[in-house]
């Protein structure tokens, strides 16, 4: 078995802390962010309950490239999105997973290293 070292680009290194702070590379955030194609956007919604299918539709329809997967990091505890959101994302051929933010950050790095097109919505 051949083992090779895999270097993670600093720009795609994700870290999460329990103090309500997200760290992406050298930048820190204390609000909901959307990580999309290497760019971070701050999202005005403050709770997961405020997300609805129209928000995802508007982001997807204005994007140059749609992801294979959207990772939802729901903060310290795992929460789930409304089933209507799952139906909309499925109609676009996009998978999604909800998990706590620390797990979402680790999963995002792994999927990126596999070359998968992945977006993330992360609550600190």
Predicted regions: what is each one?
Residues 1-54, 58, 113-124:
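Non-catalytic interface/targeting segments
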Residues 42-43, 78-81, 107:
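Short active-site-adjacent helix-start/loop capping segments
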Residues 59-62, 107:
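CheY-like receiver
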Residues 62-97:
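Mid-chain, well-packed structural core segment of small domains
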Residues 74-77, 101-102, 123-124:
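Beta-hairpin (beta-strand-turn-beta-strand) motif
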Residues 95-105:
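A short glycine-rich beta-strand->turn/loop micro-motif centered on a GG-aromatic cluster
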Residues 104-111, 116:
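Binuclear metal-ion centers of metallo-dependent hydrolases, dominated by the metallo-beta-lactamase
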């Amino acid at each position: 078995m051949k083992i090779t070292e895999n270097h993670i680009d600093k720009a795609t290194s994700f870290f999460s802390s329990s103090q309500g702070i997200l760290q992406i590379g050298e930048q820190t955030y204390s609000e909901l962010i959307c990580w999309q194609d290497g760019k971070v956007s701050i999202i005005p919604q403050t709770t997961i309950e405020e997300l609805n299918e129209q928000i995802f539709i508007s982001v997807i329809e204005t994007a140059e490239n749609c992801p294979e997967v959207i990772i939802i990091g729901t903060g310290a505890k795992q929460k789930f999105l409304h089933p209507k959101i799952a139906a909309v994302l499925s109609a676009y051929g996009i998978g999604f997973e909800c998990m706590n933010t620390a797990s979402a950050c680790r999963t995002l790095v792994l999927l990126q290293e596999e070359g998968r097109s992945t977006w993330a919505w992360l609550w600190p």
